């Protein structure tokens, strides 16, 4: 048996739902999708859900993951085995842990490939900080998986599809976190997962002010701007949402232009699926050149203006 009888899907991030739904179609015969509102339910049906389960009644001061109890009860009531697919977001991983505990089944995070062999899920994901790929065969009847971005292609909506809609009512857990305040933060409005062309900067760009050169290059070629983890986490030059690497974005663009990035493995696992990698680095021995299809050895601050000028001609 190379598919499960059913799969359960939930995404706290709407943009990740089409990808998870496509994976669900490949892995199971029946797709159940938990949603938070009617609009998401309609989208889920168009993406292939046979049954939509609307989570309803959560107080505003409670967290989404507090639905774990009623979600686990619903899953348990409708089948003895199957898959649960969640995005590998922070909330997705927290919910996965809660579901795994309540269902008493195995949880595997950051899956990069998923298959079914003899009725059991087989999962591959990065281990040892991206230095190797580990394979796990899940022995429990259910497997709760968080899926890395880009593992599956996005499902295409079909307005002619139909499905059944159900309601799952809120039940307060015995122990829970209560939200006392919410503070908005500036977040990345660009969906880098879908970008065809990406210019990514590392600390080799020299300063936050020099990132303007990379932005000009992006404008010249129609690319989106990304960065390495040190640029976002250590230097605070760019938003967290834009850094590429094993613990964040895993990209597959047509072109990945790395500017001042050394090319450590933890970064490259997020970029080495790119069709073409172009590197600019002043260190001729930088690891990035082992991955690059094309490279320029030199100071990015001098090379970028020349490159932008050449593109303008």
Curated annotation (Swiss-Prot):
The keyword Kinase does not apply. Belongs to the ETF alpha-subunit/FixB family. Heterodimer of FixA and FixB. PROSITE patterns: ETF_ALPHA. It comes from Escherichia coli O139:H28 (strain E24377A / ETEC). Required for anaerobic carnitine reduction. May bring reductant to CaiA. FAD binds at residues 255-283. This is Protein FixB. Pathway: Amine and polyamine metabolism; carnitine metabolism. It comes from the Bacteria. Keywords: Electron transport, FAD, Flavoprotein, Transport. Pfam families: ETF, ETF_alpha. GO terms for molecular function: electron transfer activity; flavin adenine dinucleotide binding. GO terms for biological process: carnitine metabolic process; fatty acid beta-oxidation using acyl-CoA dehydrogenase.
């Amino acid at each position: 048996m190379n598919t499960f009888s059913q799969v359960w899907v939930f995404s706290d991030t709407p943009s990740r739902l089409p990808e998870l739904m496509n994976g669900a179609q490949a892995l199971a015969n029946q797709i159940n999708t938990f949603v938070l509102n009617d609009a998401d339910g309609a989208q889920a049906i168009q993406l292939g859900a046979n049954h939509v389960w609307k989570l309803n009644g959560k107080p505003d001061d409670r967290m989404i993951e507090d639905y774990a109890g009623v979600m686990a009860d619903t899953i348990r009531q409708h089948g003895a085995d199957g898959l649960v697919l969640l995005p590998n977001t922070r909330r997705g991983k927290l919910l996965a842990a809660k579901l795994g505990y309540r269902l008493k089944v195995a949880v595997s995070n950051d899956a990069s490939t998923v298959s079914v062999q003899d009725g059991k899920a087989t999962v591959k994901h990065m281990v040892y900080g991206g230095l190797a790929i580990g394979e796990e065969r899940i022995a429990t009847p259910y497997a709760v998986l968080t899926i890395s971005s880009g593992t599956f292609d996005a499902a295409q909506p079909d307005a002619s599809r139909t499905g059944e809609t159900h309601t799952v009512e809120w039940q307060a857990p015995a122990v829970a976190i209560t939200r006392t305040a919410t503070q908005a933060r500036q977040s990345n409005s660009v969906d880098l997962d879908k970008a065809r062309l990406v210019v990514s900067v590392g600390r080799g760009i020299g300063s936050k002010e020099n990132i303007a050169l990379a932005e000009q290059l992006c404008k010249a070629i129609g690319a989106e701007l990304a960065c390495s983890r040190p640029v976002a986490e250590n230097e605070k030059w760019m938003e967290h949402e834009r850094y590429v690497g094993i613990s964040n974005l895993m990209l597959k663009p047509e072109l990945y232009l790395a500017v001042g990035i050394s090319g450590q493995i933890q970064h490259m696992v997020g970029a080495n699926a790119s069709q073409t990698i172009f590197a600019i680095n002043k260190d001729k021995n930088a690891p990035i050149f082992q991955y690059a299809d094309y490279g320029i050895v030199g100071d990015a601050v001098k090379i970028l203006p020349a490159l932008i000028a050449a593109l303008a001609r």
